[in-house]
């Protein structure tokens, strides 16, 4: 007999009783189209299912849990927490094949959102789902709506009907300063000088501290002090960038990302070089599909430009949860935690 306290504990059978439909499982593998499934990419996989099928049912969640080797409960908790996932369970019907999201936040309310919703509901009579949603960050062009991924400024029934009739569901990409134009105007010169040591990292931090630049998330924490604290942390060091702005009237991030994205990307690389970052996560709210398209494209160009010498960058997509603008909730989303927020005591804004 083994000595007391020296026995091996049986492996926990988390997935016992799971009935996986092989056809659904194979379909998900083809749909998601990757070799190695990652637990922390659960939300990304749920987005693929939602985008391509239009809803997420119990068979999808069971198969996804099997592919990730996690419990069905974990998948269900994550899928049902975020508003942009349509989860179908026993007793609930599938949503209409097309959804029009109409912002009913303050700016849009004042510019006719209620009338627009009424007109759409009267015209489509249940054949298209008309959904009231919180601020989508297009307050300057209220009332605003989205038809799948097509963002509609100064929306009215005629505009939305034309989009639906023409099946113009992709995001409309605005004109913006691309990488070559940005480089011709001196872009990435500062980053290159810091990376090669022509400009010392300590002098960058000192300049940042002297500028008194502060975070805009509410606490107003000095950016230079935050960088300095992080430089003293043990490695590996991870960089999480919060591009969520759900407050009505707030769309500063969308404005510069849709007009001058490389100014943001160079700032990201400067910070990563000074602080010696190992990996970067960009959390982008799901309400900005055009920005997502721009960043995916320009990040690819950026990696080629610097011969893959920049840190690994993961662009992560939100799913309609206002709370993820808060730092610990954002980090929980990056980990794909079923819990929307870390309820531990507040820490310095440079640690997680």
Language model features with spans:
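Small-residue-enriched alpha-helical segments and adjacent helix-cap loops
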Residues: 48, 53-132, 136, 281-314, ...
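Histidine-anchored nucleotide/phosphate-binding helix
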Residues: 261-273
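Hydrophobic alpha-helical segments, chiefly the membrane-spanning helices
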Residues: 346-352
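Iron-sulfur (Fe-S) cluster-binding modules
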Residues: 1-58, 62-65, 72, 77, ...
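Conserved small/polar residues in nucleotide/adenosyl-binding loops
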Residues: 335-342
């Amino acid at each position: 007999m083994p000595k007391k306290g020296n026995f091996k504990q049986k492996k926990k059978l988390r997935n016992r009783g799971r009935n996986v439909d092989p056809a659904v499982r194979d379909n998900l593998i083809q749909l998601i189209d990757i070799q190695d499934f990652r637990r922390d990419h659960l939300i990304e996989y749920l987005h693929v299912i939602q985008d391509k099928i239009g809803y997420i049912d119990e068979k999808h969640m069971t198969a996804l849990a099997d592919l990730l080797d996690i419990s069905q409960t974990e998948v269900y908790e994550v899928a049902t927490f975020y508003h942009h996932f349509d989860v179908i369970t026993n007793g609930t019907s599938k949503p209409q094949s097309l959804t029009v999201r109409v912002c009913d936040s303050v700016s849009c309310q004042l510019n006719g959102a209620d009338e627009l919703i009424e007109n759409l509901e009267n015209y489509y009579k249940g054949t298209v789902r008309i959904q009231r949603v919180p601020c989508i960050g297009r307050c300057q062009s209220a009332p605003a709506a989205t038809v799948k991924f097509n963002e509609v400024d100064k929306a009215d029934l005629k505009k939305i009907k034309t989009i639906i009739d023409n099946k113009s569901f992709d995001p409309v990409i605005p004109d913006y300063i691309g990488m070559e134009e940005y480089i011709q105007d001196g872009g990435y010169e500062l980053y290159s000088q810091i990376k090669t040591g022509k400009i010392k990292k300590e002098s960058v931090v000192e300049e940042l501290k002297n500028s008194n630049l502060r975070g805009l998330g509410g606490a107003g924490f000095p950016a230079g002090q935050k960088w300095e604290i992080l430089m003293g942390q043990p490695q590996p060091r991870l960089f999480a960038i919060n591009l969520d702005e759900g407050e009505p009237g707030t769309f500063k991030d969308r404005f510069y990302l849709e007009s001058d994205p490389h100014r943001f990307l160079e700032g990201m690389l400067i910070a990563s070089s000074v602080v010696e970052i190992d990996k970067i996560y960009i959390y982008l709210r799901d309400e900005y599909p055009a920005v997502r398209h721009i960043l995916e494209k320009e990040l690819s160009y950026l990696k080629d430009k610097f011969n893959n010498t920049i840190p690994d960058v993961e662009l992560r997509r939100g799913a309609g949860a206002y709370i993820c603008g808060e730092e610990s909730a954002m980090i929980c989303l990056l980990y794909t935690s079923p819990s929307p927020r870390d309820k531990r005591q507040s820490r310095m804004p440079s640690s997680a």
